[in-house]
Amino acid sequence: MNKWSRFKFTPNLPLGANGERVTGSKAHIELSKEAAKEGMVLLKNENNVLPLAAGSKVALFGKGTFDYVKGGGGSGDVTVAYIRNLYEGLKLQKEKISIFEELCDYYRNDIKKQYAAGAVPGMTIEPDVPAELLSKAQAYTDTAIISICRYSGEGWDRKSVIDPNNKALWEYEREMTEKSAELFKDGDFCLSVKEKEMIDTVKASFKNVIVILNVGGMVDTSWFAYDDQIQSALLALQGGIEGGLAAAELLVGDGNPSGKTVDTFAKSLDDYPSTYNFHESRNYVDYTEDIYVGYRYFETIPGAAEKVVYPFGYGLSYTTFDVETVSAGVVNSNCTSEANKLYAKVSVTNTGKFSGKEVVQVYIAKPQGKLGKPAKELVAFEKTRELQPGESQLMILTWEINDMASYDDLGKVKKSAYVLEAGSYDIYVGTSVRDVTKADYSYILNHDVITEQLSAKLVPTSLPKRMLADGSYEALPQSEPVDTDYSAIGNIDPSLTEGVAPCQRAIPYFRFADGMAKNGSHDIMDVVEGRITLDEFVSELSIDELIHLLGGQPNTGVANTFGIGNMPEYGIPSVMTADGPAGVRIAPEVGICTTAFPCSTLLACTWNPDVLEAVGRAGGEELKENNLALWLTPAICIHRSPLCGRNFEYYSEDPFVTGKLAGAMVRGIQSNNVGATLKHFALNNKETNRKNSDSRVSERAAREIYLKAFEMIVKNDNPWAIMSSYNMINGYRASESEDLLTGILRDEWGYEGMVTTDWWTCGEHYKETKAGNDLKMGNGYPDRVKKAYDKGAISRSEMETSVKRILGLILKLD
């Protein structure tokens, strides 16, 4: 096949053996199910109620039995051939268990009626179960399974109070916010009134009660964790196309739960330090908890530990494991030539009766010093293979010494530097942040060490204070605000960036046919075949041609998120992008069904990079088979608050887990010679007013928490593209931030790939290009860029730099 022939309007040629398509194939759907099983977390299992014994009879309660949520909404949605809910999954276990069908008929019919009336999956009302039906269920069995489901999506956050000023990008987003508030008077973190009534009835009526959480993120778990009338609970999250079957197989013992939490589950929403100001303003969010996010807060701040129901890294199994630290220390020449690392050698033995997997986690307790530190921070983890009863595995986990450094943004030790402060760096090994044992070895420093000297970037101007390790706050320097929306060519017309879905507005800026006069004498194939360099090719392009390449291009083929390139007179193909952190997203009207994989949070709960790489490889195959070039995933913002509507797209509250696992996803995707896109860069931790909300954060928290996963993946996994975020960061639009997109991303981290905006940002196109944002999506504003060029506000050199990065991505494709 000739170069780029997939992108030149050829049929979607199958990639599978014997001419079979891999998109939505049995193999990919099976992979989706197995990934979901590996990530689901057993939170509670008193009296070994699970797995269900052969011959068990069960009654299924809760609308979630049929109102199954495969994943979140917006760009994370996936068009699929079917969705297998919990009931359908359990029906396939008919040789092991039986189900009280009359109750299921009642729920099925009720949910069908609600869907017919316009209800969205996950947004239905919990129906009342008739007393007669309840009595029949009691007579049938003493075991009940309760399903609780939750749904959220792009463009709206989880909350219970209607914001009358919420100007959503699409009307659908406002509608969903209002519907959520109607269903959940106290917010959907908590149970609804109807859910509470149903649960109380079930507890009073059945001996054994099992809870399934089909949710996209953190919810209240205290209602079952401390209740002796509820014996078992499985955090099933949103499992994709076969999520119901994955949960069902675990319930009957066809597989052993090995997932671990990637977030801290607190007793109350108010226990999270981010809650009090999450909805304080539409215009800004103050990250006053600073680096104390998730377990870093709950394990450090006095009085916070008692607020935890299930800690970070927690998860039960049907078997038991013994985890022993054999030794720990500095990696030396006896093991490897690398002496800048520490290691922990750990033995894991399956001491129970079921085969299973365990996750070994290594945490560091740093000296508090002048900077203050979290009580523990994750530095390494590894999952065992499937261990049979009595079987052991010896593991050696290593990590960089310099990765234990902390960033000093105020000059308490050395300003704008990563510092290893003097003192003892203690090593803790175990199976959660709480279930750990201190190793015999500690890394001792007798003096401070500067590991990396940088310069100040993303300095806050309006963040009033930040939290310290003792729970108090320190005041931060303030500065005069600047007009960051100033434009040398006049303010941008708001109609370009606001209102209804902007596809129609984009049409005047798209090029649908040939007609541009060719300025240069060469073709892009001259670059491919080595006759000229890319620099030489780009130098021949006219200003208009350069500007054309700086913007998105119209959809072709099955795409619905627009493309890149599109200069046929130069042989430059129009290559397409695709949404979907949980699978390749193709619009339903196209008629192509892809594989819906588990949501990113569930994938993260596997703690298994091999699983993420396999999912990425499969998704990359589906992308390529459908003649798509750039997958707009993984999304790796941090779970700062349970309220973020897009948490299901993101991985964890911890940047190290996020970076390791999303990095594996990138490797898998790009093994197909198609591109992965890290997003949203950066600090897009809130959807409400996402195009204008200002994330006000300290430089230390930005670097140690919110940028760290991006840094890890850029340095280790070479993503082809990065998507800048809608929001502002300390008063500057992320898409226009030279500090972020050039100073940190390129100068410090050495990134050489392409940066794209999110779709229809409020940023000024020429300012985005100058800052290091190479591509404006879903379309550029060529007239404004040309006007800026004519006024001297942007140079040809700056445009050429971005065009070379865009063409560099296209040249990587086969």
Label every model-predicted segment.
Residues M1-D435, A456-D814:
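Glycoside hydrolase catalytic-domain context in secreted enzymes
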Residues D435-A456:
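Short beta-strand elements
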